[in-house]
Swiss-Prot record:
Binding sites annotated in the UniProt record for ATP: 169-176
Gene Ontology terms: cellular component: plasma membrane; proton-transporting ATP synthase complex
Compartments where found: Cell inner membrane
GO molecular function: ADP binding; ATP binding; proton-transporting ATP synthase activity, rotational mechanism
Stored InterPro entries: ATP_synth_asu-like_sf (IPR023366), ATP_synth_asu_C (IPR000793), ATP_synth_asu_C_sf (IPR038376), ATP_synth_F1_a_nt-bd_dom (IPR033732), ATP_synth_F1_asu (IPR005294), ATPase_a/bsu_AS (IPR020003), ATPase_F1/V1/A1_a/bsu_N (IPR004100), ATPase_F1/V1/A1_a/bsu_N_sf (IPR036121)
Originating gene: atpA
Protein's name according to its UniProt entry: ATP synthase subunit alpha
Top-rank taxon, per record: Bacteria
Organism in which the protein naturally occurs: Bartonella henselae (strain ATCC 49882 / DSM 28221 / CCUG 30454 / Houston 1) (Rochalimaea henselae)
UniProt function note: Produces ATP from ADP in the presence of a proton gradient across the membrane. The alpha chain is a regulatory subunit.
Residue numbers marked as site, Required for activity: 372
Family affiliation: Belongs to the ATPase alpha/beta chains family.
EC code: 7.1.2.2
SUPFAM superfamilies xrefs: C-terminal domain of alpha and beta subunits of F1 ATP synthase, N-terminal domain of alpha and beta subunits of F1 ATP synthase, P-loop containing nucleoside triphosphate hydrolases
Length: 511
């Protein structure tokens, strides 16, 4: 075999030229003990609170407890393949998730990894999950309506863009249904020509500790009704570890803040925060933090307040964007005075209180109008809605008061009887089937008919039929009237006169 020295020297020179001695320095530690989704790690002396770490099998974790001789790490994933003595690396980054329009229409887990089988995300931007809420100066008071399409809510407990409105009630009272209807109600704004960017509301649904079948059902409804294209679903289901359920709302909020900070509008539903509190309690107890009331850690109030304070309406200098939050809390046997419910009630700007017995009476959405409030109030309504909703609030309040007394006496004077009849019909009018949100102008017309006595002569059972017929008539023959209310945002004398003519004719012919 012929060896050519020139060739050998050429190969050696080539290899020397390409030799690049890169040393990777990473700070490491070792697992002392692991179990229940928590690892105790020795080493990692310079790790920061909330920093991501990586175990030797690729699972990520987050350093939460920084003690003198060890670090308490919560594991974002299964702890089955982590052993005592395994190597743990610092990643030098706080927990981040992908954000931006690339996530719309997708289902992701709490760390932003897609779980819907539609391939990888095309997101280019990442954000920290736990950031400080905007201060006082960049904010503006809530003044634009965030319509849910539900008469009972938009008329009596209005929600504004940038508000935090709690949806609270027992299990199976229709809490998720309210979120779903609010999401579906944003569809018309996305159908119009793209010039109307300021009306578009992007929706984020965070499922915490729910059954996978429930989340799949939610996604299916959004998909069938064409609402998935402007929604993001963040799912940390019941089978996910507690740290994932704890971080999911923060991740969803970071995704919503992207829209808020870019001058757009977003609506986020946390379903539900009681399960996040339970997951946080589990983590805290396993990390040996001292328990407080109901064994929750002392900072569970701070956990929820720093999350919900991130929902805000920003002023014009900061782009006029908004993030509206609808946190859900599940109560046990209507006990609103438990620890987590009272905490979240005191943080939010009002609550929608749903009751089991109303639900079983067929009053759906099962909103208890007496206990529900919106602390933003009529600032979050257009003038047309204020004009008709003011009187319905008063009449329903009087009706509730009278109905309690009327149970005892049978001989009621005519005015009381009239009040009870009107109240029963208005209550019937506020009922609404699921998946059928109404536009604001349609709600205005329906409530106008109710408070002006057009329902008084009807049997209670006919109210729903009357409403359906009226809406069908308006949509087909008087769409200009609806459009006028939508454009002028108030009931001018001219619109009122036209409306009364239509209602008189319709009521006369209704049988």
């Amino acid at each position: 075999m012929d060896i050519r020295p020139s060739e050998i020297s050429k190969i050696l020179k080539e290899q020397i030229k390409n030799f690049d001695q890169k040393a990777e320095v990473s700070e490491i530690g070792w697992v002392l003990s692991v179990g229940d989704g928590i690892a105790r790690v020795y080493g990692l002396d310079n790790v920061q609170a909330g920093e991501m770490v990586s175990f030797s099998n690729g699972v990520r974790g987050m350093a939460l407890n920084l003690e003198i001789d060890n670090v308490g790490v919560v594991i974002f994933g299964s702890d089955r393949d982590i052993r005592e003595g395994d190597c743990v690396k610092r990643l030098g980054a706080i927990v981040e998730v992908p954000v931006g329009p690339a996530l719309l229409g997708r289902v992701v887990d709490a760390l932003g990894n897609p779980i819907d089988g539609k391939g990888p995300l095309k997101a280019t931007e990442y954000r920290r999950v736990d950031v400080k809420a905007p201060g006082i100066i960049p904010r503006q008071s809530v003044h634009e309506p965030m319509s849910t399409g539900l008469k009972a809510i938009d008329a009596l407990i209005p929600i504004g863009r940038g508000q935090r409105e709690l949806v609270i009630g027992d299990r199976q009272t229709g809490k998720t249904a309210i979120l779903l209807d609010a999401f579906l109600n944003q569809k018309p704004f996305h159908e119009k020509d793209a010039g109307n960017e300021k009306d578009k509301v992007y929706c984020i649904y965070v499922a915490i500790g729910q059954k996978r079948s429930t989340v799949a059902q939610f996604v299916k409804v959004l998909e069938e009704r064409g609402a998935l294209e402007y929604s993001i679903i963040v799912a940390a289901t019941a089978s996910d570890p507690a740290p994932m359920q704890f971080i999911a709302p923060l991740a969803g909020c970071a995704m919503g803040e992207y829209f808020r900070d870019n001058g757009q509008h977003a609506l986020i539903g946390y379903d539900d925060l009681s399960k996040q509190a339970v997951a946080y309690r589990q983590m805290s107890l396993l990390l040996r933090r001292p328990p407080g009331r109901e064994a929750y850690p002392g900072d569970v109030f701070y956990l929820h307040s720093r999350l919900l304070e991130r929902a805000a309406k920003l002023n014009a200098e900061n782009g006029s964007g908004s993030l509206t939050a609808l946190p859900v809390i599940e109560t046990q046997a209507n006990d609103v005075s438990a620890y987590i419910p009272t905490n979240v009630i005191s943080i939010t700007d009002g609550q929608i209180f749903l009751e089991t017995n109303l639900f079983y009476q067929g009053i759906r959405p099962a909103v208890n109008v007496g206990l529900s409030v919106s602390r933003v109030g009529s600032a979050a309504q257009i003038k047309a809605m204020k004009q008709v909703a003011g009187s319905i609030k008063g009449e329903l309040a009087q009706y509730r008061e009278m109905a309690a007394f009327a149970q005892f006496g049978s001989d009621l004077d005519a005015s009381t009887q009239r009040l009870l009849n009107r109240g029963a019909r208005l209550t019937e009018l506020l009922k609404q089937p699921q998946f059928s949100p109404l536009k604001t102008e349609e709600q205005v017309v329906v409530i106008f008919a109710g408070v002006n006595g057009y329902l008084d002569a009807l049997a209670v059972a006919d109210v729903g039929r009357f409403e359906q017929g009226l809406l069908t008539l308006l949509r087909s023959d008087h769409s200009d009237l609806l459009q006028a209310i939508a454009d002028q945002k108030q009931l001018t004398d001219d619109i009122k006169d036209k409306l009364i003519v239509v209602l008189n004719t319709y009521a006369k012919n209704f049988s």
